[in-house]
Amino acid sequence: MKTLPVLVLSLTLLTVFSETSPILTEKQAKQLLRSRRQDRPSKPGFPDEPMREYMHHLLALEHRAEEQFLEHWLNPHCKPHCDRNRIHPV
């Protein structure tokens, strides 16, 4: 029972007086965040830019919808319906 407080006290003193303290100063934390952000490439999925992956997905969907629309309207086999010169597209 006496060994538990002694163990806790010794671990506390060890972490405080050695340079391996798990508590960082504000300056060290900001520097760590800055260096980490510069080291890793900026690609979708990183917590720095959470919306970027979703925006890439939306752009791909929009591009695919536009291709399907043009493929439908420029199809030579559906002339009376798809001819923009004769019929206004709704």
UniProtKB/Swiss-Prot annotation:
UniProt GO cellular component terms: extracellular region
Q: Which PANTHER family match?
A: GENE 525-RELATED
Q: Where is this region: Disordered?
A: 28-50
State the species of origin.
Homo sapiens
Quote the protein name from its UniProt record: Uncharacterized protein C17orf67
Q: Does the keyword Secreted apply?
A: yes
Name the predominant localization.
Answer: secreted
* Signal peptide bounds: 1-18
Q: Which gene encodes it?
A: C17orf67
- Where found? Secreted
Q: Name one Pfam family in it.
A: DUF4543
Lineage here is: Eukaryota, Metazoa, Chordata, Craniata, Vertebrata
